[in-house]
C-alpha cells in the first residue's frame, strides 16, 4: 500500500493536478500485477484510509513524503470515493430512530418490525442503524468516520432524521436523540474521546443483551414477523411485544431520556465546533404538523421537514387508508412555511385507485396550487412489499403496477411541470429488489427518465438537473435571477445564481408572509396551547394515544419537566412585519471551513444573496428579516448582522 501511495504522490507532483480515473486505475492494476497475490492487495477504497492512518500514527513516514496542503488536496481529490456525495455542498448523514408503533396504518406501507414504520431492513441507512442499535451517537460518529475515509470533508453536515413520524415518539426520547446527534458532531474532532464514547455505548447495549448481528436479529423477530406478514398481528402489536416487553430494550429505553436544556448545551458547543450542523431534517406526517410541534422542532435545531403527502386526490388518499383531508395537508404546508421550514414532500405514483392521468394531475396540483408548493420532492412509484394491505388488492386484480412505459410517462410529465425552485431529490426508494413483489425494480429509473426527456427535447427547470456539482465555477459567468411566486400565506422569492446555460451555483428562498396569515397562525397556536394546558400538557402538541404505545411509554414517561420546558416560549414565535429567509445554499465541492475550494462555495455568493433578500424585504415594507439558521450556521449569519432572537436569528432592515 505504501509503495502504491508513493507512486501516486510522485505522479501528482509531476502533473500538478488530480489523476483521472483511468490513470489511477492503471497504477493500481500495475501494482496488483507486481504483487501477484490471490486477491487484489491494492484497491482505491483502501488508499485514503491508509494515508490518514500514516499521517496520524507515523509522522516520520508522513514527513518523508514532503506533503503540503496543495499536494494533500490533490491526493484527496484523486482518491475520494463517490465524489457526488458532497457535490451539493454539504456532507449528508442519515440516521434512523428505533422501531416504534405508528399512529397510522396505510395500505401500502411496509411492516418490517425490525425497523421504524415504512422502512425495510435491507435499505442501506437501515442496515447502518440496526448495526448500531439505532443509537444516534453511534450512527453519526461512525458515518462521519466512513465519509472521512472516503475522502469527504465533514465539517458541514446535514443531519436527516428518518423513522416514520417523529412526534409519535415520547418527548424525552426525542430530546435524547437530538442531544446525542449533536454530541457526536461535537466530539468528532477528538478521536480519542469519540472512540471512548463509542466503546462505552457499545458495551452498554451488550450489557443489555441487545444483539446487533444480522442473523441474531432475524431470529429475534422471525415469529412475530411471520404473523404480521400473514395478518395475524398488526405492526404495532408486534413492536409492543418485541420491544416494549423485552427487558434489554426496556433497560436501554430507560436511559434514552434528556431535557431540552441538555440539547441546548450541545447546540452551544456546536456553534463553533469542527463538525457543524448546517441543516437538520425531521420526518413527520402532515396531520402531526401543528404550531406546537413546529415550535419544538425549531427549538431542537430543525430547518427542514419531510412530509409524506403521497397524493392530492382525496379518493386515492381514502382508498389507501391515509385518514387525512386535503385541507389538513394544505394547513401543514402553510404552517411549515410560516415557521420558515424548507418543505420536502413525498409524492407516490401508482397507489391503489390511481391512474397515470390522476397521478399527473395530482402532481401538477402539488407544484402549482398555492396551498402546497413544496421546495423539494421525493417522487417515486409505489412498490408492492409482502405483508402490506396492498397485497390482497394485487392478488384480486384491483391493483397492478404501471408498465415501465406508463411509469416513465408519468415521471417525465411531472418533471416537465416542476418549477425552477423545486428540487426533485429522488425517484426510487432504496428498497432491495428481493423485497419488491412486483413493480419497478430498476435502480436507474431517474437516468431512464432523463434519457426520455432528452429524447423528447423537453426542457427541465428543477434544481437537481441544474446543480453545478463538482465542476469549476467562473464567477464572472454568473448572473442573479429572481423567480417570484405566490402561496396562500406568503409571497415567495427564489433567488438563484445561474450560468449562461442555466446551471445553478447557489440559491436563496425568501418568504414574505401575509399579515393575516401570521395573525391566524398566532390564534391557532394560542388555542392549541390552551387545549394542551387543559389536559396538563402545557405548551406542546399531544402525543399519539395509540394503545400499543403504552408498554414503552411506561419505560420513558414524559415528565412534568419535559412537558413544560417550552412553556416559556411564546405560543407563536413570529410577528407581522418580519420576512423570512428559509434557505441559503451555495453549490460546489464542500470546502473545509477556513480552507480554499475549487467549487462555488466561499466566494461571497451567499452574502450577496442575503443582501439582495434584505433589499427585497425592505422594499416590500418589512421592518425585520428572520433566518431559520441551523445551529452550525449561526456564526455565519452573525457575521452578516443577524442577532439571536428567540428561535431564529433576526436583522433589522
Where are these regions (language model features)?
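Conserved active-site alpha-helix within GNAT-family acetyltransferase domains
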Residues: 629-648
Amino acid at each position: 500500500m505504501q509503495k502504491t501511495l508513493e507512486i501516486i504522490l510522485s505522479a501528482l507532483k509531476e502533473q500538478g493536478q488530480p489523476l483521472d480515473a483511468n490513470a489511477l486505475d492503471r497504477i493500481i492494476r500495475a501494482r496488483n500485477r507486481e504483487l501477484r497475490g490471490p486477491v487484489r492487495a491494492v484497491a482505491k477504497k483502501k488508499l485514503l484510509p491508509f494515508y490518514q492512518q500514516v499521517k496520524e500514527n507515523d509522522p516520520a513516514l508522513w514527513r518523508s513524503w514532503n506533503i503540503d496542503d496543495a499536494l494533500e488536496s490533490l491526493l484527496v481529490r484523486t482518491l475520494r470515493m463517490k465524489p457526488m456525495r458532497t457535490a451539493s455542498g454539504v456532507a449528508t448523514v442519515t440516521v434512523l430512530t428505533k422501531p416504534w408503533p405508528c399512529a397510522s396504518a396505510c395500505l401500502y406501507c411496509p411492516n418490517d418490525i425490525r425497523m421504524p414504520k415504512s422502512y425495510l431492513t435491507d435499505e442501506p441507512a437501515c442496515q447502518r442503524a440496526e448495526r448500531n442499535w439505532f443509537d444516534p451517537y453511534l450512527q453519526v460518529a461512525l458515518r462521519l468516520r466512513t465519509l472521512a475515509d472516503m475522502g469527504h470533508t465533514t465539517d458541514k453536515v446535514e443531519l436527516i432524521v428518518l423513522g416514520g413520524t417523529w412526534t409519535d415518539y415520547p418527548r424525552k426520547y426525542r430530546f435524547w436523540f437530538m442531544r446525542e446527534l449533536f454530541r457526536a458532531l461535537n466530539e468528532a474532532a477528538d478521536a480519542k474521546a469519540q472512540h471512548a464514547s463509542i466503546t462505552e455505548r457499545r458495551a452498554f447495549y451488550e450489557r443489555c443483551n441487545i444483539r446487533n448481528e444480522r442473523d441474531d436479529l432475524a431470529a429475534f423477530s422471525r415469529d412475530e414477523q411471520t404473523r404480521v406478514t400473514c395478518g395475524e398481528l398488526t405492526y404495532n402489536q408486534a413492536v409492543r411485544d418485541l420491544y416494549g416487553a423485552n427487558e434489554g430494550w426496556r433497560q436501554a429505553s430507560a436511559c434514552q431520556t434528556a431535557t431540552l436544556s441538555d440539547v441546548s448545551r450541545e447546540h452551544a458547543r456546536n456553534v463553533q465546533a469542527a463538525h457543524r450542523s448546517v441543516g437538520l431534517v425531521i420526518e413527520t406526517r402532515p396531520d402531526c404538523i401543528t404550531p406546537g410541534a413546529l415550535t419544538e422542532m425549531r427549538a431542537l435545531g430543525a430547518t427542514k421537514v419531510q412530509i409524506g403527502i403521497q397524493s392530492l386526490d382525496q379518493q386515492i388518499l381514502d382508498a389507501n387508508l391515509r385518514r387525512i383531508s386535503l385541507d389538513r395537508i394544505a394547513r401543514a404546508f402553510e404552517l411549515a412555511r410560516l415557521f420558515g421550514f424548507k418543505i420536502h414532500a413525498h409524492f407516490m405514483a401508482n397507489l391503489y385507485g390511481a391512474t397515470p392521468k390522476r397521478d399527473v394531475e395530482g402532481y401538477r396540483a402539488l407544484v402549482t396550487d398555492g396551498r402546497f408548493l413544496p421546495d423539494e420532492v421525493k417522487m417515486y412509484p409505489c412498490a408492492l412489499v409482502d405483508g402490506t394491505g396492498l397485497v390482497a388488492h394485487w392478488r384480486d386484480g384491483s391493483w397492478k403496477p404501471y408498465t415501465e412505459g406508463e411509469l416513465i410517462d408519468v415521471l417525465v410529465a411531472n418533471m416537465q411541470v416542476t418549477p425552477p425552485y423545486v428540487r426533485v431529490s429522488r425517484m426510487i426508494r432504496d428498497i432491495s429488489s428481493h423485497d419488491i413483489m412486483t413493480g419497478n425494480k430498476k435502480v436507474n429509473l431517474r437516468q431512464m427518465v432523463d434519457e426520455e426527456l432528452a429524447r423528447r427535447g423537453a426542457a427541465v427547470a428543477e434544481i437537481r438537473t441544474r446543480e453545478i456539482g463538482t465542476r469549476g465555477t467562473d464567477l464572472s459567468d454568473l448572473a442573479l435571477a429572481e423567480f417570484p411566486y405566490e402561496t396562500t400565506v406568503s409571497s415567495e422569492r427564489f433567488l438563484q445564481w445561474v450560468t449562461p446555460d442555466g446551471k445553478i451555483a447557489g440559491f436563496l428562498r425568501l418568504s414574505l408572509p401575509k399579515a393575516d396569515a401570521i395573525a391566524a397562525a398566532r390564534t391557532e397556536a394560542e388555542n392549541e396551547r390552551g387545549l394542551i394546558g387543559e389536559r396538563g400538557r402545557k405548551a406542546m402538541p399531544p402525543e399519539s394515544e395509540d394503545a400499543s404505545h403504552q408498554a414503552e411509554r411506561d419505560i420513558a414517561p414524559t415528565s412534568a419537566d419535559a412537558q413544560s420546558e417550552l412553556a416559556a416560549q411564546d405560543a407563536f414565535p413570529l410577528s407581522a412585519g418580519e420576512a423570512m429567509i428559509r434557505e441559503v445554499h451555495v453549490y460546489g465541492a464542500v470546502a473545509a471551513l477556513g480552507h480554499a475550494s475549487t467549487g462555488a462555495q466561499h466566494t461571497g455568493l451567499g452574502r450577496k444573496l442575503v443582501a439582495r433578500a434584505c433589499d427585497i424585504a425592505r422594499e416590500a415594507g418589512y421592518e425585520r428579516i428572520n433566518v431559520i439558521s441551523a445551529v452550525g450556521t449561526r456564526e455565519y449569519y452573525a457575521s452578516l448582522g443577524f442577532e439571536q432572537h428567540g428561535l431564529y436569528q433576526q436583522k433589522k432592515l
